[in-house]
Amino acid sequence: MRNMTLEHIAAVCGGTYIGNEADKKREIMGAVIDSRLVEKDYLFIPVRGEKVDGHSFISSVFEKGALAVLSEEQLENPAGPYILVKSSLDAMKKLAADYRRSLDIKVVGITGSVGKTSTKEMIASVLAQKYNVLKTEGNLNNEIGLPLTIFKIREEHQVSVLEMGISEFGEMDRLATMAYPDICVITNIGLCHLENLITRDGILKAKTESFAHLTPDGIAVLNGDDDKLCEKKIVNGKPAVFYGIGKEAKTAETEEGTKTLAEKVIYATDVEAVGLTGTKAVIHYPDKKTGEEVTMEVEIPIAGEHNVYNALAAVSVARELGLTCEEMKRGIESVQTIGGRSNLIHKNGVTIIDDCYNANPVSMKASIDVLSKAPGRKIAVLGDMGELGAEEKQLHRMVGAHFAGKGIDILYCAGTLSKEIAEAVQECSSETKVHYYGEKAALIQDLLKEAKSGDTILVKASHFMGFPEIVKELTK
């Protein structure tokens, strides 16, 4: 981490350096909060958690070769230098923001209600065809995970793709301060985190806090088919780059009446499902230099129209960063799925759609649509969606109403709120056999008896429901 000397770190964090004067000029090689990950000349940042206080590991990290540590308390006879700070977490965020600004690198920041991770994977896959890319791994998209990702950026990296997830006002302000993106992508404004953000307008306000932290030449890349995002036509004095499906601007029915959505710069036509294995589309975009329209046929190796939007976001970013049509196509067609997010598993003749990492009304309906196109018998295993606020029951019933008429043979539900899905399906559809369970164990037992070769089974719920256990049992 070039220029990250202990003296500089103390100044950035507003802390007090305590240790050998000669060590002040030494540079750290990395920064971590997990003592098990400490390597030679690393900075250890002890964070106080609900169960574990990182300060209790300070002595052990020096034994592993740590150059220094941050500390919220004075240390007696430390084995190495330390920087005394008021808050390790605040110091870490200040250090990440400073380090990001020291780097000669393009940063793509991604947020949105649905599809952040899959869009991040798509963008990273495309940009990797031309650049050395560092991306957010796993779910490290919050106020602890984002700085840890930034600390992993090295001189060889040319682009970093950073995911930013929030659940309250002010959180994006803090994240984007660290990320300082050159390009800000917002996938959509959907119904999630309503406990704190209350309405979609609240979500829009919270997500767009990121705009204040774009670089001076930074741009916003937005879903033009979203009735909230389409309002943000100018961001920091520059036109937003809108993408969507279909050339013409769409209309949407809103509380204010019929609304015409954004004119799209990048758009897709001829969207066609290829079973459960992929989605075909033709993507159109103007060449960045000549303005002439470029047409690109792609086959995305993941099912669902929502993945076309991910590809469009990737093309929008890639166009800004100078990739060729061939590079874009190669990156889109080689993207990989990750566990718990539309991951296809084949076991004993059964196809399992493992989409149980998280859920909200928008993603739940998209997964149901994918299942509806599957061959053979179709079985859905659905659980509760969390953080939906006062309208949680109504939103679960809305999913049930969407489910009805999709030609899905059997529905299994478990969880307090998913009972609303089951009841709505029973009220709207006589085709689907509906089974509701108060807990997972009985559901798993009956599902294992029911499943047979040729079935396709969708498993989806919010993460707290623990539905990976169901996938595990199905794949034994």
What is each residue range found by the language model?
Residues 1-94, 303, 373-376, 401-402, ...:
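N-terminal leader/targeting and accessory segments in enzymes
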Residues 69-76, 224-228, 245-248, 415-419, ...:
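Short, polar loop motifs at secondary-structure junctions
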Residues 82-84, 107, 133-135, 240-242, ...:
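Conserved beta-strand scaffold positions in the cores of enzyme catalytic domains, especially
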Residues 8-11, 91-224, 228-238, 318, ...:
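Phosphate-binding loop of NTP-binding sites
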Residues 1-17, 43, 182, 196, ...:
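ATP-dependent carboxylate-amine ligase
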Residues 22-31, 90-93, 141-144, 164-169, ...:
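Short gly/ser/thr-rich secondary-structure transition/capping motifs
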